[in-house]
Swiss-Prot record:
Its EC number is 3.1.3.16, 3.1.3.48. PROSITE patterns: TYR_PHOSPHATASE_1, TYR_PHOSPHATASE_2, TYR_PHOSPHATASE_DUAL. This is Probable dual specificity protein phosphatase DDB_G0283417. It comes from Dictyostelium discoideum. The keyword Hydrolase applies. One of its GO terms (biological process) is regulation of JNK cascade. Has a dual specificity toward Ser/Thr and Tyr-containing proteins. Signal peptide: none annotated. The active site is at C174 (phosphocysteine intermediate). Belongs to the protein-tyrosine phosphatase family. Non-receptor class dual specificity subfamily.
Length: 230
């Protein structure tokens, strides 16, 4: 049986806690008591952050999405590929010239925030003529961000640049290579290869264990799956 007096005593002895919030713009503020009204007067503003998850353990390799394409998809394939050279990585992978060359990555889909494209035509003189075809789609790693509305543009770029005679590869990266890029690639597998969400997520994690779409993105992927009528 619950002892109300004991619970009341424990509650009175509890220490006041401070909760830190970060909004989509990167503004950080602290609330002294989460049970109190979250008003402007109850907030303590902190230093701003970048507005995205910062990767504290940089890695500079692109990870291939290992998948066997179903024969039914190959039979109705408009891209003429027998394998898909899709890669995922962090922003560091997008700067690794040697790795990009070794993996025949000719195109990069940049879905991060504030990340420069290094191997552009304008920079070819300082990169020994090495040129990458880029597409920038800015996506915030925020649970309230509508990522579904970005899918079509991402799919179009991937379809336009993947495969070919040389079976060129495409790297999809964000800042940390964890949430945004994973969500885009999962949605692509769902849409183009008819692979259910759960299996698509498993495929991404087997290629790059760090992959973890935020909860808001996962909810949107569930909605997207229902729209695809699996």
């Amino acid at each position: 049986m619950v002892n109300l007096e004991e619970l009341s005593l424990k509650r009175n002895n509890m220490k006041r806690t401070e909760t830190t919030f970060t909004d989509i713009s990167g503004k950080r503020y602290q609330v002294a008591n989460i049970n109190e009204e979250n008003s402007e007067s109850n907030r303590i503003e902190l230093n701003r952050t970048s507005g995205f998850v910062i990767d504290t353990k940089p890695d500079d390799l692109s990870h291939k999405i290992e998948i066997i394409i179903p024969q039914s998809i190959l039979n109705n394939n408009n891209n003429n590929y027998e394998s898909i050279n899709l890669y995922i990585g962090s922003q560091d992978a997008a700067f690794n010239k040697l790795d990009l060359q070794l993996k025949n990555i000719k195109s990069i889909l940049n879905v991060g925030i504030g990340i420069n494209n290094l191997f552009t035509k304008e920079n070819s003189d300082i990169n020994d003529g090495f040129i990458i075809n880029y597409c920038n789609v800015e996506i915030f790693d925020d649970v309230n961000f509508n990522i579904i509305e970005k899918f079509d543009k991402c799919f179009e770029f991937i379809d336009s640049n993947i495969g070919g005679v040389e079976n060129n590869g495409i790297l999809v990266h964000c800042n940390a290579g964890v949430s945004r890029s994973a969500t885009i690639l999962i949605s692509y597998l769902m849409k183009k290869l008819k692979i259910p969400l759960s299996l698509s997520l498993e495929i991404l994690k087997s290629s790059r264990p760090q992959c973890k779409p935020n909860q808001g993105f996962l909810k949107q992927l569930e909605i997207f799956e229902k729209e695809l009528l699996f």
